Amino acid sequence: MKKIAIIGAGISGLFIANLFKENPDYQITIYEKNTSINIDEGYGVQLSTNSIKLLNRIGFNTLEIKDKFNPEKIDFFVIKQEKKICDLNISEFNSEDCKYTTLKRSKLVEFLKDGLKDDIIKYDHNIEKIEKNNDQIDLSFNKNIKAICDYLIISDGVFSKGKSLISNNKIKPAYNNSIAIRGNISRNKIQNLNQNNISLFMGRNFHYVIYPVNKENEKLNFIGVLEYQLTANELDNYSLFKKKTFIQSIKDKLKNELSITILENIENIKCFPVFVSKGYLKPGKNIFLLGDAFFAFPPSFAQGASQSIEGASELFENIINNKNSFYDYRVAKVKMINNRSKLNHFAFHASNPIIIFFRNISLKLLTKNKKFLENYLGKIYKN
């Protein structure tokens, strides 16, 4: 029996553990640095059909209907006029069992966690050293805890300590000159929006998205991305982003970019600096990276969670079939999505009136062009 160690109990780590749990040839252990998994936050996540198909293999289709939502379209708006430009029918990529889905991230994590036995996840295990020892991998954690594995899967997020250890701290994420703003907003505070769809608003160096996270009458999810310069000292002071003064400064900056009705009614606001990957790391034999540890995308294509799931499925198939194609295939897919994310960011944040004019015309045409959509979205949404 081969031992698999997974560093990090995020979406990718939990999902691949669910795939391996029924295979008697492998023993899985997840090492999580925190003392528990936070399933209290109500912020949303979008899952396109490529990941729903994979999640259904472990019973996601049995999740209660009330706990998830299937939007049919993305409605595009210009912030200034609050004027709808066009819509994109994302349901065209749906099948009977695989539909574009939004839900609370905590609900997805809870589902993945509940699929595993309690003893699979070891909490309060902070990785400190990774060493290759012939065909085995030696792991050292805090409190002098040691472990040995045959395969090591590093899935501990964008600031991956595991990745830093195997790269000798040479590969780090880069600040993307933008702040992500998360929150919730009551349905009765929103007017002139189809609350059955995803609403995407484009502005000057800023865009935001509002969407439902379940079929109950709960608050809508709000996520905005604002271009914002930070000094090195500010980036090192992560507690800064939790301070009320900083959050208020962001809200003040948005007064000219966002309708007062929405701005004043966003609840549970949290701000995060957006970090992205700038390169790829190919680890040694039997060591793998997943999720944001593999590559962190700019948040303009809503593929972070879906790619964590898809990458985990690819790695699972590679390991059980003793293949070596995981890295090259994943890099090719990631490059495709990263390029689309950058293009989306440019389009959503355009400030030049001429560029905005042609962007709006292009959106009206391209959102109805099936050949374009099959190439731009179909290559991502279908696996």
Predicted regions: what they are:
Residues S12, S36, F159:
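Conserved Rossmann-like nucleotide-cofactor binding loop
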Residues S36-L54:
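Conserved N-terminal glycine-rich FAD pyrophosphate-binding loop of Rossmann-like flavoproteins
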Residues C86-Y100, K104-R105, V109, K189-N268:
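Conserved FAD/dinucleotide-binding core of flavoprotein oxidoreductases
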Residues N360-N383:
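C-terminal auxiliary extensions adjacent to catalytic cores
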